Amino acid sequence: MNTDFTNLTTENLSNEHLCCIIRSKKSHPGIEAKRQWLSDRLNEGHVFRKLNAKATVFIEYAPLETAWVPVIGDNYYYLYCLWVLGSPRGNGYGKALIEYCIADAKEKGRSGICMLGAKKQKSWLSDQSFAKKFGFEVVDTTDNGYELLALSFDGTVPQFAPNAKNLKIESEELTIYYDMQ
C-alpha cells in the first residue's frame, strides 16, 4: 500500500489535483470554485487529505463550528467525505484515512467526530457501516431517514438542528444553505 498522503494547504492547493470532483480532462469552472472554497476553509481548520496518486482516495473534514451543515454540537469534527474509489478500494486506504482523522481529533482535544448517514445508504454519503467499525454510533435521526453518526471521546454528542430534524421551518423566513464545495 502506498502510504504517501498529502494534506492540502493554502501553499500547495493550486498545484494539487482535487480528486473528489469533475473527472474531466478539460478545465472546468467547478474545479476553480472548489479551490477557492477550500482556500477560505483551510484557514478555519478544514482538512483535505489525499493519496499522492492519480486516484480518488481522500478524506475531508472540518471543525463542526465552521462546517456548512445543520448539525449542532461543540468541539467536534464534521466528516464531510471519506472516499476510496476503484482499484485502491480494499487495500487499507479508508482505514488509514479514518485513523488519521481520529488521531488528529484526539491530538487537537476534540470531543469527537460526526458524519451524516442514512437508514438506506445513499451513493453520495460515506459508508456508515465502515465508520461503525471504528466506533461511530447513530446519535440522532431525522423524520426522513437521515442519521447523524458520532464517535464521542468525552460522552457528549451532537444533534441535528431542529429544522433539519423535522424538515419544518417555523417562521416566514427561509434559510438557504449553498456552498461551492
Region roles according to the model:
Residues 1-52, 170-180:
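Short amphipathic alpha-helix that is part of the acyltransferase structural core
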Residues 54-66, 78, 83:
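Conserved beta-strand in the GNAT
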Residues 66-79, 89:
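A conserved beta-turn-beta hairpin within the catalytic core of GNAT-like acetyltransferases
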Residues 84, 90-105:
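Conserved acetyl-CoA-binding loop-helix of GNAT-fold acetyltransferases
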Residues 105-120:
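Conserved GNAT acetyl-CoA-binding A-motif
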Residues 116-117, 135-149:
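Conserved catalytic-core motifs of GNAT/GCN5-like acyltransferases
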Residues 127-131:
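Conserved active-site tyrosine of GNAT-family acetyltransferases
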Residues 143-170:
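C-terminal "cap" of GNAT-fold acetyltransferases
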